[in-house]
Amino acid sequence: WVCCLSKVFDSLLMWAYYNNHRGVCIGLNMEKVAKYFDASLGLIVDKHAHEVQYRDIIEKPDYFQNEEDFFHYQMCTKAKVWEHEQEARMFIFKPFPWIMLPDSNNKSDLIDRKEVRAFPRIGGECFESIYLGVNINEKESGLIKIAKKLNPDIKVYQMKKNTNAFKLDAIHINDE
């Protein structure tokens, strides 16, 4: 499982090529997300986001020299033309049976199989903000209700085209 994230919410290019300004951008508190990843059972989870490296030239590391560098290069390298995305990636690998086995020395250390997931859940407090695209329609605006149900304190913004510059502005929507 790969979760691709961005450090920016107001990129004209990303809003344009991800659903022509009709999508949403969700702001996460990564420190709070990491706490949930600490508690994930049965998973190999890397709770830290890896920043994507942008390159003009392909320089593959040697797998036999440094396995970690090789993995990072394969999973976190993109062409330099994508640099405006400021992307970071998180990885969660499928559970392995031996990770889910209880400690043989501690019989009370049984794992409740209902708590083992292939995808960790995060709490509503992890969702800090939601940005609605410039061209979002009324049907999609029902997302505000869903967002408020997850986190009543979530901040909701409507993206608007700036009339004086080639950029987007995030306008805070008052609570209704």
Regions found by a protein language model. Give the residues of each.
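Catalytic-core loop-and-flanking beta/alpha module that positions acidic residues
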Residues: 1-176
